[in-house]
Each structure stands twice: as structure tokens, then as C-alpha cells.
């Protein structure tokens, strides 16, 4: 009887050790799976971000298009510099305050197409520009900083209809003609001017 009890104790010990080893292997395997998932998420982050940027381009461009059209109508009159005092605090931020596309914080308008949306990173700024030989304030300009390359060239293509001048990273993608008539826009040129990442600056100007 004693021998049987001893055998049972040995068996129980072996079973306990086996369960412990199985539990250890399970934890190791679980940790490995979690690490693998983390790596896959890190690898796919740019693609995920690019997807969200692409889905926002259309709505963002449409809102800016409406804003520029409305602002141009307000600028019609006898003044040769109707946009001399245009700025974010008085014009852009109030117009976008209830936007579901942009994020407004005070006078800062984040476009959410790249960048942090803080300060001048990933934001939209409006200001007076000189167009067609006119003085400063004869036109208005919208500047979008830190735009992701996935927004190229869709953003510029949509805003082409309300812009007389478009530049991408400091290089003109559309300019006025020799007689100040609207110039031509090439989407391929705009695409070629873009660089990878949240490193693109767009300027759209009109009168």
C-alpha cells in the first residue's frame, strides 16, 4: 500500500511538472504572438495612415473649394487689395469652426492630411498675396503644411478649379498666363513635385 502511495506521489509530481512546463510554453508562445502582432502593426502603420489620408482628401478639398469660392465673392468690389487683412483668426477659423473634416483650435486649423496639427505643422494658413501684377492683398493664398504624399495630386486637382496659382514644395504647378489669364494645370507635374511622407507644402492662390 505504501508503495502504491509513493507511486501516486511520483505520478502527481510528474503531472504537475508537465502542466507547469506546458503553462510556461503557452506564455512564451503568447508573448511571441504579441511581439509578432506588434511588429506587423508597426510595419502596416504607414499604409493605415495613408488609407485614412486618402479618404480625407476629397472632403477636405471640397470644403476648401467652397471656402475659396465664397471668399472670392466677398472680395468683389472697388478695392484693389480686398484681401489685405485676411487671416486665420478673422476668416479661416470661423468658417471652419463647425467642420467635420478639419480640426479647429483657436486660430489654428489642422487639415488632418498629415503632420501633427499643432503650431504650423499640418495646418492651414490664409493670408494676402500679390497676383497678376497687383499689390499685396490683391489675392488670397491658402498654405497647407506637412501634407502626406497620399494626398498628391488629388488635393491640387480638386482645388485647381478655384486657384490661379498652385505651388508644391516651392515649385509652381500652375501659374498665370502672360496676360494674367488662368494657366494650365498638370496633375502629373503636381505628383512629381511631391515627396514621400508628411513633408509637402501646398499653396493655392486666387483673386
Give the location of each predicted region:
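Detector for methionine-enriched segments
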Residues: 1, 42-45, 68, 96, ...
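N-terminal functional modules and adjacent low-complexity/disordered segments of proteins
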Residues: 1-3, 22, 34, 69, ...
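N-terminal single-pass transmembrane signal-anchor helix
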Residues: 2-63
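Arginine residue identity/basic-tract feature
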Residues: 14, 19-21, 56, 66, ...
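Generic alpha-helix signal with a bias toward terminal, lower-confidence helices
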Residues: 37, 55, 60-64, 69, ...
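Membrane-proximal N-terminal amphipathic helix
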Residues: 49-96
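Periplasmic/extracellular, small/polar-rich flexible segments of pilin-like filament-forming proteins
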Residues: 80-207
